């Protein structure tokens, strides 16, 4: 086995000196540990997110300690709580303002499926307007569940190439647009 075959295996350590990796792997690794969340909190799940950000659970050890309150400075949105139809366009506009690549975590039963509010004014799942990457069950979910979702998102970012991620998001957005197409009467 020659040097060329040996060096063509990304992810292998060669002594204590260096590790061989592709540029895509390095970018994915760095991106997975520097997710900047934008918390969109509307209900009790927002309180659980505050607990997650405190010292007892320490979201900082996962690289997401910098909550951004400007969507242009964030690349991940956490939808925490009930979303009404009146809020849906605002949430979509905030999602559009996020930095690329964009990630979405739907936290709690209300954000994921409308929760106990099965009424005409409540959106029955945020996945009707945004391409959701990870769902967190619970009403409200424990901080450990939110951290577990963050770890799952990190693994997804590390395993998925940038181009594959872009194609997946575009496919999800096309599905959302197709589902929400207005009825035109001719």
UniProtKB/Swiss-Prot annotation:
> Which BP terms does GO give this entry?
aerobic respiration; electron transport coupled proton transport
Cofactor(s) it depends on: [4Fe-4S] cluster
Q: Which GO terms describe its molecular function?
A: 4 iron, 4 sulfur cluster binding; iron ion binding; NADH dehydrogenase (ubiquinone) activity; NADH:ubiquinone reductase (non-electrogenic) activity; quinone binding
Do the record's keywords include Nucleotide-binding?
Answer: no
- InterPro entries the record matches: NADH_UbQ_OxRdtase-like_20kDa, NADH_UQ_OxRdtase_20Kd_su
Alphabetical list of Gene3D superfamilies matching this protein: 3.40.50.12280
Q: Which UniProt keywords apply?
A: 4Fe-4S, Cell inner membrane, Cell membrane, Iron, Iron-sulfur, Membrane, Metal-binding, NAD, Quinone, Translocase, Transport, Ubiquinone
Catalytic activity, as annotated: a quinone + NADH + 5 H(+)(in) = a quinol + NAD(+) + 4 H(+)(out)
Enzyme Commission identifier(s): 7.1.1.-
The record ties this protein, via NCBIfam families, to:
nuoB_fam (TIGR01957), PRK06411.1 (NF005012), PRK14814.1 (NF011389)
Q: Write down what this protein is called.
A: NADH-quinone oxidoreductase subunit B
State the encoding gene: nuoB
């Amino acid at each position: 086995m020659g040097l060329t075959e040996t060096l063509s295996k990304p992810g292998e350590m060669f002594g204590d000196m260096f590790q061989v990796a592709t540029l895509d792997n390095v970018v994915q690794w760095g991106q997975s540990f520097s997710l900047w969340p934008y918390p969109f909190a509307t209900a009790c799940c927002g309180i659980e997110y505050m607990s997650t950000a405190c010292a007892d659970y320490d979201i900082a050890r996962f690289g997401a300690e910098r909550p951004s309150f400007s969507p242009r400075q964030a690349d991940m949105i956490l939808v925490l709580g009930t979303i009404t139809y009146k809020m849906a366009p605002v949430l979509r506009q905030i999602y559009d303002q996020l930095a690329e690549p964009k990630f979405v975590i739907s936290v709690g039963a209300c954000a994921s499926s409308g929760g106990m509010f099965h009424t005409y004014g409540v959106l029955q799942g945020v996945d009707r307007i945004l391409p959701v990457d990870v769902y967190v069950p619970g009403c409200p979910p424990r901080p450990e569940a939110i951290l577990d979702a963050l770890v799952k998102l990190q693994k997804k970012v590390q395993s998925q190439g940038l181009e594959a991620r872009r194609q997946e998001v575009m496919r999800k957005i096309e599905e959302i647009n197709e589902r929400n197409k207005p009825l035109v009467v001719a």
